[in-house]
Amino acid sequence: MAKKILVMDDDPTIADLLREALADEGYETFMMTQSLRFYDAVREHKPDLILLDLMMQYLDGRDELKLMQMDDHNIPVIVVTAYLDAGKEEEEFRKAGVVKIVYKPFDLDKLVELVRSIIGGPEGKTA
């Protein structure tokens, strides 16, 4: 069974780019562009990894991380953001499950390799 990745970005172009690149690698991907159903999507799909934009419309990425932390989800999160000060909050993010902060614009191939290094290949194999 393929590993599942939830891609969440309010820019549909970026979300679809990430979703498609990871699906091409063999991962099962789910894309969201609005944060209102984030928590429901996490519970429904039970992803192995989340790619999360910090600056979202209703709930921002920080709120979503707090919701996950309150429910004791142990899902690794890669924050993908244009918010250049995100590094100043790195310790707080790490407590909430963030394993890496990637700044936009990003190198897509390097991001895919980062995903593979965190959760292994789509079927659980390491690179």
List each language-model region with its residue ranges.
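Charged docking surfaces used in two-component/phosphorelay signaling
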Residues: 16-24
